[in-house]
UniProtKB/Swiss-Prot annotation:
It is found in: Secreted; Fimbrium. Tip adhesin component of type P pili that binds preferentially to Gal-alpha(1-4)-Gal-containing glycolipids such as globoside. This tip is common in E.coli strains that cause human cystitis, but rare in pyelonephritic isolates. Disulfide bonds: none annotated. It comes from the Bacteria. The keyword Signal applies. It comes from Escherichia coli. Belongs to the adhesin PapG family. One of its GO terms (biological process) is cell adhesion. This is Fimbrial adhesin PapGIII.
């Protein structure tokens, strides 16, 4: 009997451990902030720096997300951990204009994740906090007054090159909140993933106000390059062009960059091209440069011309008659 006793004890203890259940509930309290910053006088060539300043923000938070997982009440001890979250966007659109935001300083936060749309910043500030029995998960909509001692972050804003002179207020929507996890065991760790947090309502607004004193403007928002009616035998290498003017109030460099909207039928090496259908491509040039990009310099305020050209290309084994159509997008990029 003695030689079986250790095995019997081991199996009994193992069975008891398997029967234990680990419980966790997660809650997220979000703040409804509405922050105003003093208006800044800028030019579109400036990289504008501003702070998502929480000092003047709300202290009342609303429970906006819960994952109780059946763990809503306990009669024994439970343990809590807390994270502060600040999620800020990478771009803001308003009245047809886009500004692009870059994280310049994260302050006391760590950058937990980022995607094409947002920076997800967090700071853990309490772990394994023991609590007596009670409710461990609450109902959506519950309000609490929560302290915030984590500060904010600093962002750089890049303005659209064609933003007209005038006064603008861009609403920067962001998410600020406190995540609380409750466990019926010590040592639990869990952060809400960014893919889930991205779906939360961004109830914070920072009103980014600027007075634009100088920028650059094209004379047209679109160009149509028409090759006219051509014989299939004479269309190859046919060239057509259109010119627009670009006016700048301030000295600057502008990089003009083409993006194809219709895929070409052929490979053209370093030359930029778009597909026109029926076995035809258009090789596009900007001021005579056909690589898809060029830079123009304004040493003083003034107007310069930009000529966009199209040269038809097709191989005899593939070309067909028909209506040819293609398009590209021309970006104006400041340094």
């Amino acid at each position: 009997m003695k030689k079986w006793l250790p095995a019997f004890l081991f199996l009994s203890l193992s069975g008891c451990n398997d029967a234990l259940a680990a419980n966790q509930s997660t809650m997220f309290y979000s703040f409804n902030d509405n922050i105003y910053r003093p208006q800044l006088s800028v030019k579109v060539t400036d990289i504008v720096q501003f702070i998502v300043d929480i000092n003047s923000a709300s202290s009342t938070a609303t429970l906006s997300y819960v994952a109780c997982n059946g763990f809503t009440w306990t009669h024994g001890l439970y343990w809590s951990e807390y994270f502060a979250w600040l999620v800020v966007p990478k771009h803001v659109s308003y009245n047809g204009y886009n500004i692009y935001l870059e994280l310049q300083s994260r302050g006391s936060f760590s950058l937990d994740a980022e995607d094409n749309d947002n920076y997800y910043l967090t700071k853990g500030f309490a772990w394994d906090e023991a609590n007596t029995s009670g409710q461990t998960c609450f109902n959506i909509g519950e309000k609490r007054s929560l302290a915030w001692s984590f500060g904010g972050v600093t962002l750089n804003a890049r303005l659209p090159v064609d933003l007209p002179k005038g006064d603008y207020t861009f609403p920067v929507k962001f998410l600020r909140g406190i995540q609380r996890n409750n466990y019926d065991y010590i040592g639990g760790r869990y952060k809400i993933p960014s893919s889930l947090m991205k779906t939360f309502p961004f109830n914070g607004t920072l009103n980014f106000s600027i007075k634009n004193t100088g920028g650059c403007r094209p004379s047209a928002q679109s160009l149509e390059i028409n090759h006219g009616d051509l014989s299939i035998n004479s269309a190859n290498n046919h060239y057509a062009a259109q010119t627009l003017s670009v006016s700048c109030d301030v000295p600057t460099n502008i990089r003009f960059f083409l993006l194809s909207n219709t895929n070409p039928a052929y490979s053209h090496g370093q030359q930029f091209s778009v597909g026109l259908g029926h076995g035809w491509d258009s090789i596009i040039s900007i001021n005579g440069v056909d690589t898809g990009e060029t830079t123009m310099r304004w040493y003083r305020a003034g107007t310069q011309n930009l000529t966009t050209g199209s040269r038809l290309y097709g191989e005899s084994s593939k070309i067909q008659p028909g209506v040819l159509s293609g398009s590209a997008t021309l970006l104006m990029i400041l340094p």
